[in-house]
Amino acid sequence: GKTFGCLAFAEKLKEKLKDKSCRIIYCLPYTSIIDQNYREFQKIIHHYLKQKYEEKPHRFLLKHHYLTSKTLKNRNDKNHNNNENRSYKDYLEDKLLVESWQPALIVTTFVQLFHSIFSNKNRNLKKFHNIINSIIILDEVQNIDPDYYLMIREVFTIFARRFNTYFLLMTATQPEILSDEIAIDLVNPEPFMRNSIFNRVKMETNLKITNSDKFLKNFTTNFKERNALLVVNTKKMAVKLFKSIEKKFNDFECYCLTNYLIPKDKERKIKKIRAKLDTNKKIIVISNQLIEAGVGLSCKRGYRDVSPLDSI
């Protein structure tokens, strides 16, 4: 919901600015959720532009992170053939397009954005001129390390005042990156939070469970649902808990999601989990913190290991 809401706001702001060269740069903390959001943006843009988007998709939308292929698909260049020299030329053109952020909407990571602003390497600076005069959306902004808040605040202020750049910070738990003097709250959450639709989750706390053995005993005794999500703080703990639960719950399909998985396997496993949940299969998912930034799995019951406030 908030992803589409912020994109709609950015488009309205772009219309008000009456600047066709203004780009929207949508930034996320993890590569694991970029593909999901990118596909949703593809659907929206294709719905409105149809053939224009099909002919030149990379004019309108681009995905960029460290795993992104530098060779773009769906090229409609009539001169594109298997000739070795021309293929290399196409590769260089594609690489330049990806690394310079020329399209109207870019989906990328915090790392790519901040490297382009703070780095002095030519590779990162290729896109600097396209960051200027743009609308930058930072989703799940609470994942930024607090040690960088002051530096980011100063840089954002300079970009906003001198380079006509707008920053939209999105999160359910807004950190103190920007002060009230330089930032505007777009939404007052109080009226929304009083709506009964948000009163759909019951939270229970148990601080007596201080280790994985105690949790496993409690979980084995009390768990009665058809599906559950267990989130812990480390990859090592996720694997340990997964092995224990898999042995005890033979009639459930158990999945472990951690950064030990390569991105392709992670995406494949998330798709499989989502399909199982949609058909109400008996399933238990154990994960570390990679699940917390918009991966989009909905289980009947969730368990969260004790963690810092910005992770809750």
Predicted regions mapped to residue ranges:
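SF2 helicase catalytic motif II
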Residues: 111-113, 124-158
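Interdomain hinge/linker at the junction between the two RecA-like core domains of SF2 helicases
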Residues: 172-223
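Inter-Walker segment of RecA-like/P-loop motor cores
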Residues: 48-118
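Conserved strand-helix element at the start of the C-terminal RecA-like helicase core
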Residues: 23-34, 222-246
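Conserved RecA-like helicase motor core of SF1/SF2 enzymes
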Residues: 260-261, 282-312
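Conserved Walker A/P-loop ATP-binding site and its immediately adjacent core
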Residues: 21-46, 65-68, 176, 235
